[in-house]
């Protein structure tokens, strides 16, 4: 799992309190987070699924997921999270669920995250969360070879998105404050 331990504790609490029967995560990477979400649902007694969307799901990630005890709770879609064909597949899958949480953790550029916010925020159900991860990129300048960084990051995208959508979501800063070290400052949003 490529996350901060403090965030993982908060994620568990959010799943326990909101009880989503579907967690959508954009960005699969090595598959650890997808398995984490499925394991937390099961631990909380939630009969649910985790939908992972990634432009390039590597074989080692697929193997990790299919070798896990949670393979039956996980469904993967390969393709760009903002492509119409992929969005239609997500819409079809979402229609089977009532309580939906979204975790955005794929391409971290401002434009991509803003597109994801505009698309995936519509899937989040009342009182469930939209987590925008790696907003901390905006506060750091440690990888200048990337297409993202200060000013073009998940945080800059969230700030722009919330100008027009603040009536739909409320920032749950108490989680950020409790996490202390978080990859998602300004990234915990609950649908109201």
Question: Model regions: which residues?
Answer:
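S-adenosylmethionine/decaboxylated-SAM
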Residues: 2-192
């Amino acid at each position: 799992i490529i996350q901060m331990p403090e965030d993982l504790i908060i994620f568990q609490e959010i799943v326990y309190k909101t009880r989503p029967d579907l967690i959508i995560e954009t960005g699969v990477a090595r598959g650890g987070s997808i398995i984490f979400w499925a394991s937390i649902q099961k631990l909380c007694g939630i009969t649910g699924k985790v939908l992972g969307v990634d432009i390039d799901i590597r074989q080692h990630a697929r193997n990790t997921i299919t070798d896990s005890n949670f393979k039956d709770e996980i469904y993967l879609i390969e393709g760009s999270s903002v492509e119409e064909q992929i969005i239609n597949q997500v819409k079809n899958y979402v229609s089977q669920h009532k309580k939906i949480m979204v975790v955005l953790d794929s391409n971290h550029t401002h434009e991509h995250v803003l597109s994801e916010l505009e698309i995936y925020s519509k899937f989040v159900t009342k009182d469930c969360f939209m987590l925008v991860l790696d907003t901390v990129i905006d506060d750091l300048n440690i990888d200048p070879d990337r297409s993202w960084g200060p000013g073009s990051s998940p945080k800059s995208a969230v700030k722009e998105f919330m100008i027009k959508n603040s009536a739909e979501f409320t920032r749950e800063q108490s989680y950020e404050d409790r996490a202390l070290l978080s990859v998602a400052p300004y990234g915990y949003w609950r649908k109201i």
